[in-house]
């Protein structure tokens, strides 16, 4: 996935979508 921003509190999640 290409995240707009990565939330370090939600590791493995980008813009609310799980990046696999």
From Swiss-Prot:
Amino acid composition bias (Basic and acidic residues), ranges on this chain: 1-10
Segments of this protein annotated with the region Disordered: 1-20
Signal peptide: none
GO terms classed as biological process: proteolysis
Cellular component, GO annotation: lysosome
Record flagged with keyword Disulfide bond: yes
Alphabetical keyword list: Disulfide bond, Hydrolase, Lysosome, Protease, Thiol protease
Family listed: Belongs to the peptidase C1 family.
Biological function: Thiol protease that assists the parasite in burrowing through the gut wall and liver of its mammalian host.
Protein name per UniProt: Cathepsin L1
Protein source organism: Fasciola hepatica (Liver fluke)
């Amino acid at each position: 996935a290409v995240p707009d921003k990565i939330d370090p509190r939600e590791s493995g999640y980008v813009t609310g979508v799980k990046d696999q």
